[in-house]
Amino acid sequence: MSLNPLDATRKDGKISLGPTGLSLFSNIARGAELFTVSAPGGYISAADAVTNGYTIKSGTSMATPQVSGAAALVAQAFPWMNGKQLADVILTTANSNIECPDILVGFDESTETALVFYYFSTEKPSEEQVIKALTETYNKDPEAWGYRSLNSMIEYFVKDHFEKSEAEQEQDKYVRLIRVTKEEVFGQGVLDAGKAVGGPARLDVNRMSSNSVKTYAEFGNTAYAFEVFDTQGHMAVFNNDISERLWDDKYYHEEYRTGLQGISRLTRSSENSILADKKPGLIKTGWGMLALMGTNTYSAPTIVEGGSLMISPRPDGSGGILVNSSVLVQKDGGLLGTGTVINRVINNGVFLPGTDEAPFTVGDYEQGPTGDLLFIVDRYGAHNQLKILNTAKVEGTLSLGLEKAFYTNEFSQRLQLTDLISLADGGKNRN
């Protein structure tokens, strides 16, 4: 994961950058967009060992602790995650809602002194626009430019550049105008530590490997790319909405792209070729529980190999939905909650659906021979409920139990199957 230091403010969820929002020394994210996050790195109050006080510093050395600290918080929330998954959380929760000037100014001293102007419009900026951007950036923080004079840079660099022919401008060592996208400048966005502790916000095929690809007979042996979360006995909550990103050639060198020019090389040399047409899904494995509380729109199935998966809304009532993904509960897995799976639930394990006030809602329900559909009645007669919108096919076991409590000898409760399982068509499609 690379870093891009900047100076920015946040208001109403939007990141705003002024003329000096992008640090002059930034190399931007171009060519490394997929694994770059931007973080505050300009004019940071840092500890000074010489004076035992504080000093103002700028640079990636100031941005790095911001990201490292956020990663530590994520690791504290999800101690079972591996390093790749911690990076995924940081990258997918970064704030890409960024407002900035049309032209950003940088200063490149890697080879020879050069002014770099990054612009977002389709047309190359005029001399007047470049001078205005340079002037605003310089006047905002003259000290950052050291010995360099604004007037001398305008006269000897900018004006000289625009007096040259187009071919000469391309070879100019002192002024470069580079057209970019915001992603090429800021990468995946600006670090958002608060959102990061809520878990990943996207399943990204581009950050998976060929080992991520699996098939399941229940889904026609179609190959999908899965992110595997082994909770290792922990309780974890993914509070963010989880979307998806499919394979995108723009993140890869020509040799690894999937177009006509790259396909033969892909077949021979790249394991990533297997990912090119795959949709991302999620596998929950290991002891413990993982709760999905967002409005999740990723396409491929959600598999419960071990432990429990909870699908429930957030405390404010939002989320708790799988919009596109179906759920497969294997024999060592469990499913519970008060959420909604719009597509299909296939239960070969244990399913404890909903409550009496908030049923678990599914589009289609299928239960295999090893499946157990579990209902619990408390001493007041309240019980959980499953709501099926379309079709149901149930094998295996339907279990009815009592909540652990004190019951009088006179306690009794009469229940109809329709009290436990609600079918939208009144039971016509029940098998």
Question: What does each model-identified segment do?
Answer:
Residues 50-53, 60, 66, 208-327:
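Extracellular repeat-rich scaffold modules on cell surfaces
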Residues 334-415:
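Extracellular beta-strand/loop-rich repeat segments of large surface/secreted proteins
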Residues 1-72, 76, 80:
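Extracellular S/T/G-rich loop segment that most often corresponds to the catalytic His/Ser-adjacent loop
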Residues 6-7, 11, 26, 76-227, ...:
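C-terminal subdomain of the subtilisin-like protease fold in secreted/lumenal serine endopeptidases
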Residues 4, 289, 308, 350-352, ...:
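A structural signal for beta-strand register positions
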Residues 273-287, 299-303, 330, 343, ...:
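Surface-exposed loop/turn motifs in large extracellular/passenger domains
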Residues 4-7, 42, 95-97, 314-317, ...:
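Acidic glycine-/aspartate-rich tracts in secreted/extracellular proteins
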Residues 306, 314-316, 324, 330-333, ...:
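Tight coil/turn sites that cap or link beta-strands
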